[in-house]
A protein has these predicted regions:
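Sec-dependent N-terminal signal peptides
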Residues: 4-13
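N-terminal soluble domains immediately following signal/targeting peptides that reside
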Residues: 18-167
Length: 167
């Protein structure tokens, strides 16, 4: 009985030492407006680890008066490697419209709002969200997709990093 209690205690303390590896993404496209918008919610410690290899770095200072002059460029370089949206097999070049921070400490999130005007009739949309899968084997990325009047939610990760919708 005592050995089982110790084993349970050790296994639960190990589980508590591993944080939840998760990002949220909402993709919206309404053909009447010809606008693609993407909202990403990423934990700031994960962003810092991906960009400057230090989760608690204050070097980039996102959304602060002393934000590093290359912070947006570094962020977009990373996102362009691990995240994209394609219409009819053509990658859409997203641009940062705004960013904001929410939460405190390890729970501080960096919200990134990206947009791009797009024209034409679309038959397919492909999404890749492999953000932080280069750093964490257990990273999961939840994606909510809204196209005109249809919605879908998917979970992407290291093994399955892309998803295709056909209209």
């Amino acid at each position: 009985m005592y050995k089982w209690f110790i084993a349970l205690l050790l296994s639960s303390s190990v589980a508590l030492a591993h944080p939840l590896r998760l990002s949220l993404c909402e993709i919206e496209f309404y053909s009447k407006e010809n606008l693609l918008s993407v909202n990403l919610k990423l934990f700031l410690t994960d962003v810092n680890e991906a960009l400057v290899f230090d989760p608690y770095s204050k070097e980039l200072a996102f959304c602060q008066p002393n934000e590093h002059s290359d912070a947006d460029k570094m962020l977009m370089d990373y996102l362009n490697r691990f995240f994209y949206v394609k219409f009819n097999k053509k990658k859409i070049g997203l641009e940062i419209k705004k960013k904001k921070l929410s939460g405190q400490g390890d729970n501080t999130a960096l919200w990134i709002y990206l947009e791009k005007s797009v024209e034409g009739k679309f038959d397919s949309m492909e999404i890749k969200n492999a953000v932080f899968t280069d750093l964490f084997y257990d990273q999961n990325n939840i994606v909510y997709i809204h196209v005109n009047d249809k919605s879908k939610s998917i979970m992407l990760n290291k093994e399955t990093s892309t998803y295709e919708l056909n209209f």
